[in-house]
Amino acid sequence: MSPEAYVLFFNSFNLVTFEAFASVSLIIATVAFLLSPGGLAWAWTGSSKSRVSIPGPSGSLSVFSGSNPHRVLAALAKRFKASPLMAFSVGFSRFVISSEPETAKEILSSSAFADRPVKESAYELLFHRAMGFAPYGEYWRNLRRISSTHLFSPRRIASFEGVRVGIGMKMVKKIKSLVTSDACGEVEVKKIVHFGSLNNVMTTVFGESYDFDEVNGKGCFLERLVSEGYELLGIFNWSDHFWFLRWFDFQGVRKRCRALVSEVNTFVGGIIEKHKMKKGNNLNGEENDFVDVLLGLQKDEKLSDSDMIAVLWEMIFRGTDTVAILVEWVLARMVLHQDIQDKLYREIASATSNNIRSLSDSDIPKLPYLQAIVKETLRLHPPGPLLSWARLAIHDVHVGPNLVPAGTIAMVNMWSITHNAKIWTDPEAFMPERFISEDVSIMGSDLRLAPFGSGRRVCPGKAMGLATVHLWIGQLIQNFEWVKGSCDVELAEVLKLSMEMKNPLKCKAVPRNVGFA
């Protein structure tokens, strides 16, 4: 072989060898990258220490695209022995999740986790300007001050008792008409309670109420807006976790959100304008609903019309679905546990002098078993087991011994905590008595059961929501015996925006003899 040919052969061999080496190295690096503890997104962190110190599954999970991510994540935390804190990835989004009360409290109470991640749908639907998703700062603090001082104060909640009682009795009347007209005497609970809950929110927020039987009226129109918004917020949007997909809107989320917001602006904006005109003619300055309150704010607290629309729109969401879903879960449990329903009915009858009058807010403190039933339902079926708990680390922070980098999404698996046998005796059993023997607070101070959140981002309307649920459950049990219908009650769940019954409750409602009309 000539020297020139030898050199050419040697260089070609080196080139092939280098390409093979580079390919093998790339494959090895990619595999190592994907198998990093916590997965794909954690492999991008600058500190190797933060990557390996928190246990978790490798790769990139699509856990949120399923119907029960809270169960999947609970099983993974158990498998990796990572209940205090587990790392995982969804695309390029970096997550940590806690399934333990102590670590959960550390996360939810920390100023490092004062922000919330804003999904594309939440941003497009204006929620980045509302209480739930607004960035931590002066604007958010102003919203929180408005909520606690003006909107959800004990005095304001008490002032709406008549609204709650009236809508509860409207539901009773509607159910009676349905079971009378239905050959089987059955009713689909959520349809009634959801419309009642929407009516309750509309009356307290906007001062407007709708007829249960009005087909294609404003109430049905608003229900469609709310249902569309819930679906959009609950969709697993790949663009939230793969930044390069945001340009394309493959799932049509952005397009649907913008179409919905146009309708919301027209609907809510029109109501605000009506209130402005009414306010101009109201010399006494009476505040009958939340719009009146917001329009009456002074100076630094005053909101622009666009921000007011965002705040009011969020209230419709937060106040409608959660209440309706919780009432449905409670009634499902009452159908399945007739002995517990009987005991509750006797407690209500005793508090109302053997049912000679309808239940009122003042009776609720005298109904500990009712309160225990609601707590036990919240324990077994927390409305927001995962997604409503998400927080965003605004800077690097240690959670226990673990370094959590800025930009990490932190979550609490409340479902896992409330089903933990180390925390709760016989956790799968429905036993309201556990809350009679121990008075567990559900307002956020005890992370064994905190369905409304905790810390800075605790739900501002929790007291009003509980007042509504307690009263309506009491009214529905006082007026009806709830029994199994033609179909079995199935407790299968599906997590959308809230954790709902997969198969809506359909059962018999047998009217009781009461001493009031």
Curated annotation (Swiss-Prot):
Its main location: membrane. GO terms for molecular function: heme binding; iron ion binding; monooxygenase activity; oxidoreductase activity, acting on paired donors, with incorporation or reduction of molecular oxygen. Heme binds at residue 459. It comes from the Eukaryota. Keywords: Developmental protein, Growth regulation, Heme, Iron, Membrane, Metal-binding, Monooxygenase, Oxidoreductase, Transmembrane, Transmembrane helix. The chain crosses the membrane at residues 20-40. It is a single-pass membrane protein. One of its GO terms (cellular component) is endoplasmic reticulum. Disruption phenotype: Reduced size of leaves, sepals, petals and seeds. Increased leaf number. GO terms for biological process: floral organ development; organ growth; positive regulation of cell population proliferation; positive regulation of organ growth; regulation of growth rate. Belongs to the cytochrome P450 family. Plays a role in regulating directional growth at the meristem/organ boundary. Is required for the promotion of leaf and floral organ growth and for the prolongation of the plastochron. Promotes organ growth in a non-cell-autonomous manner and may generate a mobile growth signal distinct from the classical phytohormones that prevents premature arrest of proliferation, until the correct primordium size has been reached. Functions probably in association with CYP78A7 in regulating relative growth of the shoot apical meristem and plant organs. Plants over-expressing CYP78A5 have twisted and kinked stems, defects in floral organogenesis and reduced fertility. This is Cytochrome P450 78A5. It comes from Arabidopsis thaliana (Mouse-ear cress). The gene is CYP78A5.
